[in-house]
């Protein structure tokens, strides 16, 4: 089932945009609340309203090693403090339609969306977020800001992420030979990128290799090409996306 933007109803309360996707024939109703931070052109999505269980899953994931590493890398890449990657609107009478846990859209598209078992809802959620970002670009009007981002630029960026995601889904770890996205444990479904070459490894296998080499006093070499590396970067994709 393809995402259909004609089925979106848009409203707003205070600084929150509410997107309602209603497809009566297919019995689909999805509400997505989005906050746009104009200062750094960042979007925060309410995962509580999508499904209350997602907020609990996210809080648990954030405490695990994979979650902590991902949050650290995202904070570094975006320049946003980790504490500012999430926002909470408290539940009260005034906020009953918008309360919940809001998280950086990167976390929704690259992490949380994989926890949704319904592939149709996954597709619609991805479409809603991409549609909103493409139609709500904004550049602050300040003397120091001379760069503008067009809707076409945003679409190109989103297409690039989609292309990398599609390729990543098929990539196998060069050590265990399993498809990285198909590994049983959630924490294993990340790539460990070496700064020396482009060989593919899951984060778990390459970390074990790295630890074993250190313990035995051996140099940090790629298991395949033996090129020496200095850093391992944890990534949801098989390569870094600039």
From Swiss-Prot:
First-level EC class: transferase
Subcellular location per the Swiss-Prot or TrEMBL entry: Host cytoplasm
Domain KilA-N, chain residue ranges per copy: 21-131
Keywords, in A-Z order: Host cytoplasm, Host-virus interaction, Metal-binding, Modulation of host cell apoptosis by virus, Modulation of host ubiquitin pathway by viral E3 ligase, Modulation of host ubiquitin pathway by virus, Transferase, Ubl conjugation pathway, Zinc, Zinc-finger
Signal peptide: none
Pfam family, one: zf-RING_2
InterPro entries in alphabetical order: E3_ubiquitin-prot_ligase_p28, KilA/APSES_HTH, KilA_N, MKRN-like, Znf_RING, Znf_RING/FYVE/PHD, Znf_RING_CS
Statement: the UniProt record of this protein carries the keyword Thylakoid: no
Note on domains (UniProt): The RING-type zinc finger domain is required for E3 ligase activity.
Protein's UniProt name: Host range factor p28
UniProt source species: Cowpox virus (strain GRI-90 / Grishak) (CPV)
